[in-house]
Amino acid sequence: MSKLILILTAQILLLTATALAGKNGEDFARTINRKHLGLGKKEKLTHLRVYWHDIVTGRNPSSIRIQGPVAKYSSSSYFGSITMIDNALTLDVPINSTVVGQAQGMYVGAAQKEIGLLMAMNLAFKTGKYNGSTITILGRNTVMSKVREMPVVGGSGMFRFARGYVEARTKLFDMKTGDATVESNCYILHY
């Protein structure tokens, strides 16, 4: 009987040790075949041109200030301000042109001596072959520059594993309301 208890105890200890051996913190990661995620395909370069409509006025603004700028910088740089956006992306400059998606995210006044914004947004496409796909932009936007360049840091759907950049050019800016239309040329490498 004591031999049986000893054997059972040894087996329980062995099973417990085996179960715990996989919990050393290294079993959460593994190498997989690139082809399982569609990475065996040839990489493509896609150019998208959309117009981003930042509407801060009216009954249905698409851009809402969450936090105003620090008082010291309120008129010079907007430093410290936080604005959430759900801006229409259209095929042409007029806001009533065909909507192909939304720019959703935020911009933050991040510069003290100029109007320099930190842009963090997803361009979420709603039509055509890119319906349901997104690209993610995270970068600096010096609003007063004629052309601004921001990096594409990722994407989803058709733009999985995306990288690239966006060139932004202001097409319309209403000094009274603050409403703006920006042309965005997106150059995206993806599979």
Swiss-Prot record:
<comment type="subunit">
    <text>Homodimer.</text>
</comment>
<dbReference type="Pfam" id="PF03018">
    <property type="entry name" value="Dirigent"/>
</dbReference>
<keyword id="KW-0052">Apoplast</keyword>
<feature type="glycosylation site" description="N-linked (GlcNAc...) asparagine">
    <location>
        <position position="131"/>
    </location>
</feature>
<feature type="signal peptide">
    <location>
        <begin position="1"/>
        <end position="21"/>
    </location>
</feature>
<dbReference type="InterPro" id="IPR044859">
    <property type="entry name" value="Allene_oxi_cyc_Dirigent"/>
</dbReference>
<protein>
    <recommendedName>
        <fullName>Dirigent protein 3</fullName>
    </recommendedName>
</protein>
<feature type="glycosylation site" description="N-linked (GlcNAc...) asparagine">
    <location>
        <position position="96"/>
    </location>
</feature>
<comment type="similarity">
    <text>Belongs to the plant dirigent protein family.</text>
</comment>
<keyword id="KW-0732">Signal</keyword>
<dbReference type="InterPro" id="IPR004265">
    <property type="entry name" value="Dirigent"/>
</dbReference>
<dbReference type="GO" id="GO:0009699">
    <property type="term" value="P:phenylpropanoid biosynthetic process"/>
</dbReference>
<comment type="function">
    <text>Dirigent proteins impart stereoselectivity on the phenoxy radical-coupling reaction, yielding optically active lignans from two molecules of coniferyl alcohol in the biosynthesis of lignans, flavonolignans, and alkaloids and thus plays a central role in plant secondary metabolism.</text>
</comment>
<dbReference type="GO" id="GO:0048046">
    <property type="term" value="C:apoplast"/>
</dbReference>
<keyword id="KW-0964">Secreted</keyword>
<keyword id="KW-0325">Glycoprotein</keyword>
